[in-house]
Amino acid sequence: MDVNPTLLFLKVPAQNAISTTFPYTGDPPYSHGTGTGYTMDTVNRTHQYSEKGKWTTNTETGAPQLNPIDGPLPEDNEPSGYAQTDCVLEAMAFLEESHPGIFENSCLETMEVIQQTRVDKLTQGRQTYDWTLNRNQPAATALANTIEVFRSNGLTANESGRLIDFLKDVIESMDKEEMEITTHFQRKRRVRDNMTKKMVTQRTIGKKKQRLNKRIYLIRALTLNTMTKDAERGKLKRRAIATPGMQIRGFVYFVETLARSICENLEQSGLPVGGNEKKAKLANVVRKMMTNSQDTELSFTITGDNTKWNENQNPRMFLAMITYITRNQPEWFRNVLSIAPIMFSNKMARLGKGYMFKSKSMKLRTQIPAEMLTSIDLKYFNESTRKKIEKIRPLLIDGTVSLSPGMMMGMFNMLSTVLGVSILNLGQKKYTKTTYWWDGLQSSDDFALIVNAPNHEGIQAGVDRFYRTCKLVGINMSKKKSYTNRTGTFEFTSFFYRYGFVANFSMELPSFGVSGINESDDMSIGVTVIKNNMINNDLGPATAQMALQLFIKDYRYTYRCHRGDTQIQTRRSFELKKLWEQTRSKAGLLISDGGPNLYNIRNLHIPEVCLKWELMDEDYQGRLCNPLNPFVSHKEIESVNNAVVMPAHGPAKSMEYDAVATTHSWIPKRNRSILNTSQRGILEDQQMYQKCCNLFEKFFPSSSYRRPVGISSMVEAMVSRARIDARIDFESGRIKKEEFAEIMKICSTIEELRRQK
């Protein structure tokens, strides 16, 4: 039968059709090879935007640095980083005038956070530049390595466990004449295998001590490693992102804490909230502009785009902002917060792995590391790369590039939002002193601007004034990429607004389906995604029911667990049929064991094990929820887990789902090939770290324990806890006298060993 597709839309309001315009199916593009080229692009662009600034040389590291601040005034149309300090300070002052006490309160809040934050805050986060090994590591390992090196160099403030004390060590480390570090290296030798009599390569891992002088240590402490941003849709070219080292991270965290606290109290800020809360906040601003405009007034909204936001921002401006925001605060607090922008003004960008060369015959491949780019003959490179390298050479020091202007991606999102909002704030009539006025929304580099005026000339004048005001603080609104609509229709951070925010359900499509963690988690994540979309994204009941059926089908095909009474033949069907036949209550079998689906849109919030528990055969219950089941090494029981879901656009979101641990919550074993590489020493360190933490959790079983504050170490805390527990158990008759004596003896031995060490 032929259906005219336009009929589908007869009854649908235009804004609901947005989900049909979705272009992103299939996998997003990933980057391969090195990010060196992209990083060079970033560095060269950043310097180009600030090229009329003043050049100076850093006395400590010898790095050439470009400072565009308070230099020439910015020009129309050309993006530039020529911010003016007094303009930024004035914008801050007006922001404070419109929000009395906002800075004062945020400072007090931040001071409290600083006093309480533990150093393990820095273990959150993914890859981190590890300065001791000069490459990326998981955050926890990088922190452990840094602390280990600090302690072996006599920096011990960090032992209190407070982040602020660790940062004292960081400051002190920068004054030391040299730092001694331990590096892992790998020896290869050819030996004859006794069994097969063949020659094999034997690898041994060694550790060696290395001394870094002050200059080299400073360069490493100020280094941001760079990687290529993966999975970006809708871009032809890849781009570079930065991962800072442990010296910078703690300072950035405190600055962002302050800025986050300010953003929470600014109605125009799209950060730090998200989801529905963000939509409500933004809808308020639009409503305000609509109701405050007189009937005769025109109101237009610009869906804004800024040119190269972070390459035109400048750490020196952030320093000025912080100096102003904290002006009446204690000296120590002002110092702690000003260190991050100062470090960023002196930052070095690591160029990554370098370039890969292949010979014409493709027989030979060789890697030119970034360190060699200073000396290598440029005839080997193509035209565009040659230009890049020539530009960057004067800035190179040991494979890192001096990059004073610019911020690198994703570093000061909150603080830069405060700067953006301070310009939106200047749109009030009392500041514009004329007939036009503006307001808007800002979230990191994304903005929407609402301008009201009596006529079109007024609107144009308002937009021009906004554009030029932004220029003065280093924000470059792109005239080519921003567009204007009558207020009521605009886009902001991938939310589309048309008389209210439109649910764009298709954005969530990539997160439907089977995640591939394990049978238990996948089932839970799958139904939670459907549930969340019913709550947040206008996924209707009929569509949700269909999504659920498709998910179950997908799940059964992924894990080859079709119903026990099906005709479909798979590798597992023989076993599952047998289980089906010997199960009395077939409804109690999990879907992953060939059972039926009991899910519908009303019970998506219940984990499958709980849903079917009463229906299960007793022996099946016993096998399913048995932590001692020898065939499965499974996860500890946690009530709530986090999954990372990828929407089509925007950052990966963390989503909570209920996790009931069963024998289906298995963990795949680690690939063994890592054990033969130089990573092995690091892996062993990591496992040791993990073991210590697990042991500690055993002594303090409730996860709500207050971590031992003060100077007691983990070992001391565990020993004293063991003594207390043993005494209680002995006095209540739970353990015998001999056992009690033995525990006390072990505790004394441990303390003795610590003293000798």
From Swiss-Prot:
Q: What class of enzyme is it?
A: transferase
InterPro entries given in the database record: RNA-dir_pol_NSvirus, RNA_pol_PB1_influenza
User: What ranges does the record list as Polar residues composition bias?
Assistant: 55-64
Ranges where the record places region Disordered: 50-82
Q: How is it modified after translation?
A: Phosphorylated by host PRKCA.
Reaction(s) the record says it catalyses: RNA(n) + a ribonucleoside 5'-triphosphate = RNA(n+1) + diphosphate
Self-association and partners: Influenza RNA polymerase is composed of three subunits: PB1, PB2 and PA. Interacts (via N-terminus) with PA (via C-terminus). Interacts (via C-terminus) with PB2 (via N-terminus); this interaction is essential for transcription initiation.
Q: What is this protein called?
A: RNA-directed RNA polymerase catalytic subunit
**Organism this protein belongs to:** Influenza A virus (strain A/Leningrad/134/17/1957 H2N2)
Species lineage, top-down?
A: Viruses, Riboviria, Orthornavirae, Negarnaviricota, Polyploviricotina
